């Protein structure tokens, strides 16, 4: 296998500065939705040495204690003392929250179709998209959960790194960390693990030699073994393992780098295997199609691949602000389609209602479910609340496509 093509994806742990911000923003959103499921929110967070700043726009009938939510989330991640470089109990928290612009609200609350007299009697025609934009969804047969293999493994490594820290198995680890996986592909088939890069914050008491040996033993090898157990066959015998390749990594988290909500959009999605419309997810309620339509596109793509319409499928949807119906739908199958692509597009249109209100209703998105999406990927984790991962439209798509 000398002609393998190498594809790489990365992930980060929950203690990475940008991911701290995503989790804070989504924790605030969850609290708002708990108080008022119709809350509109766009919450942005910045963290830096000793300070958290929360800003954005919120319209709600509820009340939430934002500083307390911030502190609780930071401590849960593991930043609970000055020794690790950040302390949720003592850091500064500033809040600058305003109301959603009425100019935006008017288009969401009363759609273009409603205002122009072209709306049907269907209530889903009455809510417009919260912004213009384009969103992508993707699925492939690389893994049992229909995710590309490089990002799947990168997430599992990051999750495992956090797990052995929280459990005390590797007690010297600290919250910040990054993972990266390079997979060798023969055509469209993943064959080898070429390189694993793992950088983890740690305390001063451990040598780099011990850290590298124990991270390989307790993190990398168990993740590769677990992948094999679910049928992912990879040759990792010649894999290059680069663990803390710069040496010591004691200063991390917000003390090492400032963090911002929405700066890990490729980590959040498909690891670069699919295109991205540019809109981040965290801190946004589901009236924002940046989030809800991206979730719907994952639902569409996963069901389409599971239905046998293609082995790899990317789907794009586009919206105009204030308009209920999408303005565009596009499918790319990278030469793997089992039926003509135009038939796939027709089947998707027949099977899925992609108006924003219909997406929110079908995927039950007005729930406080978002903090759990904010680390280790919004897609490919088949958790009970992740309705967009359900394979519940397979038969409908097969019927609509004539299979």
From Swiss-Prot:
Keywords: ATP-binding, Cytoplasm, Magnesium, Metal-binding, Nucleotide-binding, One-carbon metabolism, Potassium, Transferase. Its cofactor is Mg(2+); K(+). Its EC number is 2.5.1.6. It catalyses: L-methionine + ATP + H2O = S-adenosyl-L-methionine + phosphate + diphosphate. The keyword Zinc does not apply. It is found in: Cytoplasm. ATP binds at residues 16, 176-178, 248-249, 257, 263-264, 280, 284. Belongs to the AdoMet synthase family. This is S-adenosylmethionine synthase.
């Amino acid at each position: 296998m000398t002609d393998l093509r190498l594809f790489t994806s990365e992930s980060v742990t929950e203690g990475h500065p940008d991911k701290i911000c995503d989790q804070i923003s989504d924790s605030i959103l969850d609290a708002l939705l708990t108080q008022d499921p119709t809350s509109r929110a766009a919450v942005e967070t910045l963290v830096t040495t000793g300070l958290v700043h929360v800003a954005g726009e919120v319209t709600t009938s509820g009340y939430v204690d934002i500083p307390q939510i911030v502190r609780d989330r930071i401590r849960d991640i593991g930043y609970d003392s000055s020794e690790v470089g950040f302390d949720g109990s003592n850091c500064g928290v500033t809040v600058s929250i305003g109301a959603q612009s009425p100019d935006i609200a008017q288009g969401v609350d009363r759609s273009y179709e409603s205002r122009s007299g072209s709306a049907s009697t269907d209530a889903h025609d009455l809510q417009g998209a919260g912004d213009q934009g384009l969103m992508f969804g993707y699925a492939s047969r690389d893994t049992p959960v229909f995710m590309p293999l490089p990002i799947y493994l990168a997430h599992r490594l990051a999750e495992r790194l956090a797990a052995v820290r929280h459990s005390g198995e590797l007690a010297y680890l600290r919250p910040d960390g990054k993972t990266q996986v390079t997979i060798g592909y023969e055509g469209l088939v993943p064959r080898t693990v070429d390189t694993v890069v793992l950088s983890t914050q740690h305390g001063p008491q451990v040598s780099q030699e011990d850290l590298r040996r124990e991270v390989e033993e307790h993190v990398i090898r168990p993740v590769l073994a677990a992948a094999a157990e679910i049928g992912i066959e990879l040759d990792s015998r010649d894999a290059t393992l680069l663990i803390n390749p710069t040496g010591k990594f004691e200063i991390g988290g917000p003390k090492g780098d400032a963090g911002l909500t929405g700066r890990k959009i490729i980590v959040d999605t498909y690891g670069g295997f699919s295109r991205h419309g540019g809109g981040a997810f965290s801190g946004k309620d589901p009236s924002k199609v940046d989030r809800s339509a991206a979730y719907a596109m994952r639902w569409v793509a996963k069901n389409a691949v599971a239905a046998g319409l293609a082995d790899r499928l990317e789907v794009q949807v586009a919206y105009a602000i204030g308009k209920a119906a999408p303005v565009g739908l596009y499918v790319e199958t990278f030469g793997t389609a089992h039926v003509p692509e135009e038939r796939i597009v027709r089947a998707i249109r027949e099977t899925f209602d992609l108006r924003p209100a219909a997406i929110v209703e079908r995927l039950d998105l007005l729930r406080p479910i978002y903090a759990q999406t904010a680390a280790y990927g919004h897609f490919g984790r088949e958790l009970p609340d992740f309705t967009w991962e359900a394979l519940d439209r397979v038969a409908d798509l097969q019927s609509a496509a004539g299979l």
